[in-house]
Design a protein with these regions (language model features):
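Glycine/proline-rich active-site loop of Rossmann-fold NAD(P)-dependent oxidoreductases
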Residues: 129, 142, 154-170, 180-181, ...
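C-terminal "lid/loop" region of Rossmann-like NAD(P)-dependent oxidoreductases
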Residues: 187, 215-219, 230-233, 241-258, ...
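Residue-level signal for the nucleotide or nucleotide-sugar donor/cofactor binding architecture
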Residues: 39, 68, 76-79, 122, ...
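N-terminal Rossmann-like NAD(P)+-binding domain of SDR-like oxidoreductases, especially those catalyzing
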Residues: 1-151, 309, 319
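Non-catalytic, hydrophobic alpha-helical segments
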Residues: 54, 200, 204, 220, ...
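Hydrophobic "lid"/C-terminal helical patch
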Residues: 1, 204-208, 233-236, 282-289
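Amphipathic terminal alpha-helices
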Residues: 278-319
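Hydrophobic alpha-helix immediately C-terminal to the catalytic Tyr-X-X-X-Lys motif of short-chain
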Residues: 130, 134, 138, 168, ...
C-alpha cells in the first residue's frame, strides 16, 4: 500500500515495531518511517501530525494463538487500535481506515456478509470487533470519516514466512524448502479463501480516497476460489516437487472450519474484481521465499496459557 501511494506521488509515513516484518520490505529513503509500537499513545500522537488519512493495518494477527496468549494479542489489537484512533482524532485527521479481520464473523453460516450478526469465537476476533465498534463511537463523537476493511487471508511477497503461528502458505513453503514435512491441523478439510495483496490495494484506495464512501464496512478479497488445506498442500507439493505426506495433528481449539466471505458489496461499490488467480498468488509467495532463502522459525510470542489444550506444535516448538 505504501509503495502504491509513493507511485502516485503522495507523501507516505509508516510506523511498525518490526515484530512482524523487516526493514528490507521498505525503502526508508522514500518513506518517513518510525519504529514504534502503536500501543504508545504519546508516540502515536507525535507521529500522526500533519497527516490527512491514517490507515491502521497494524496487529498481532494470530487468531489461533489468541486463545493461549490472550493478554498479549488483545492488548496489541485493541489498546493499540484505540491509541491510533485517539492520536488521529487529536491531530484532526480527516479519515481513518481500519483493517479488521474476518475473524470478526466467527463460526456462522458462510459466505460471510457484512450485515450479518457476528459471533467471534476467539479473543483475536473479539478484539478486532471491539476496535471496530470503538472507532464508530469515536468517529461519530468527534465527526471524522472512517471506513472498515475486512480482508481475508491476504498472501503475497514480503509476508513474514518464519512465523510458526500464521500464514499457512508461507509456513508450508518454508518447511518444504527445508525438506521438512508440513503439519496440518485436524483433517485438512477446512475451507479458506486467499486474497492476493495486489487485488486488495485498489479496494483499500477507494476506502481511503473516495469521499462518497464513508462509515462503511467491506469484505476485501475473492469468493470464487475456495480451497481446502489439503488441496492447498497438494498445489504446493506439485509446485515444489515434494512427495512426502503432511503430518496430521489434533485440531486447534476454536478454529473455524469454513471461513468464506462474500465479495458482493465490494464488487458493487468498490469495483472489486479478482485479477490474480490463487495459483499465481501461491507462485509469487514461493518465488519470494526462494529468493530470500528458507529460514528457521522464530517464536516471538510467549504462551501465556500452557496446558493440555495448547497445541503440542507450539509447546514443543516443532516448527
Amino acid at each position: 500500500l505504501a509503495e502504491y501511494y509513493l507511485s502516485k506521488k503522495h507523501k507516505v509515513s509508516g510506523c511498525d515495531n518490526l515484530i512482524g516484518g523487516t526493514l528490507d520490505n521498505i525503502d526508508v529513503n522514500k518513506i518517513n518511517f518510525f519504529k514504534a509500537d502503536c500501543e504508545n499513545l504519546d508516540e502515536m500522537t507525535k507521529i500522526i501530525k500533519d497527516v490527512d488519512v491514517v490507515v491502521h493495518t497494524a496487529a498481532y494477527p494470530h487468531e489461533g494463538l489468541s486463545s493461549f496468549s490472550p493478554y498479549l494479542i488483545c492488548k496489541s489489537n485493541y489498546i493499540g487500535s484505540i491509541s491510533v484512533f485517539t492520536a488521529a482524532i487529536q491531530n484532526n485527521v480527516k479519515r481513518v481506515v481500519f483493517c479488521s479481520s474476518m475473524a470478526r464473523y466467527g463460526d456462522i453460516e458462510t459466505p460471510f456478509f457484512e450485515e450479518q450478526k457476528v459471533r467471534p469465537v476467539d479473543p483475536y476476533g473479539v478484539s478486532k470487533l471491539a476496535a471496530e465498534n470503538t472507532l464508530k463511537i469515536l468517529a461519530d463523537t468527534h465527526d471524522i470519516e472512517y471506513n472498515i476493511a475486512v480482508p481475508h487471508n491476504i498472501i503475497g511477497p514480503k509476508q513474514k514466512y518464519d512465523d510458526p503461528y500464521r500464514n499457512v502458505v508461507s509456513i508450508m513453503t518454508n518447511l518444504i524448502l527445508q525438506n521438512r514435512r508440513p503439519i496440518i491441523y485436524g483433517d485438512g478439510e477446512q475451507t479458506r479463501s486467499f486474497s492476493d495483496i495486489d487485488d486488495c490495494i485498489f479496494c483499500l484506495d477507494k476506502l481511503i480516497t473516495d469521499k462518497n464512501i464513508n462509515k462503511e464496512t467491506f469484505n476485501i478479497g475473492p469468493d470464487e476460489e475456495n480451497i481446502t488445506i489439503n488441496e492447498l498442500y497438494k498445489i504446493l507439493c506439485n509446485k515444489l516437487k515434494y512427495n512426502e505426506p503432511a503430518v496430521y495433528v489434533k485440531d486447534r481449539p476454536n478454529e473455524v472450519k469454513h471461513a468464506i466471505c462474500s465479495a458482493n458489496k465490494a464488487r458493487k461499490y468498490l469495483d472489486y474484481k479478482t485479477s490474480v488467480t490463487l495459483d499465481e498468488s501461491i507462485q509469487k509467495v514461493i518465488d519470494f521465499i526462494k529468493s530470500k532463502g528458507a529460514k528457521k522459525f522464530t517464536y516471538n510470542y510467549r504462551l501465556e496459557i500452557n496446558n493440555e489444550n495448547t497445541p503440542e506444535t507450539w509447546k514443543k516448538k516443532v516448527f
